[in-house]
Amino acid sequence: LDELKKGVKAFADNLIKLKNAPAITEYYAGPVLLEDGACSSVFISNFLKRGALFAYRKPDTDRAQSVKTLDAPLGMKIVDNRVSIKNYSSLDKYNGVPLLGAYNIDAEGIVPAKEMTLVENGIFKSMLNGCTPTLYAPQSTGSSRFLLSSRNGMFSTAPGTIHIEVEKGTKPEKMKSALIKAAKEEGLKYAYIVRSLAGKASRIYRVDL
């Protein structure tokens, strides 16, 4: 109960801070550092979608909604060469924390590989797909997942548990120092750190130089 009270108080305090925080109204063109949830938001919006790490087959008719794709064939570099991305279907715990992505068989009856490399050292290696063949994913990877909110057994291409690994990553303190240095080199008086991207509830912090 005490932990619950602490969590509720922390949540309330954060809401008050957001309400009282000044709005950013001036134009800003300079370096920005993404941290915490902002990093995952950018990753999800750019990679965890159809036409990126999820295979996508363009419809035959123009009436269907268009999907923006990576337009990068397998074997091309799509991200920094220190980054590797893997998909795990059987990983049910990580550091003792239960995960929701583990499954033994997908919605179309296909048994997925336990581990699948999607990006290796920045190179686009493979994409997740269901039973509908596409140009770069002609076979199913066992990645058809039932929608949690669906009552009609609907499913779509989705991952198990995505693991992102960065070789020789930089510590947060050095990243902040690099941000300040870059802002000073551009003659700016401040820079921004973004820790959450959620519309009006986004958490953006100004760092005065």
Stretches found by the model and what they are:
Residues 1-209:
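N-terminal small-residue-enriched
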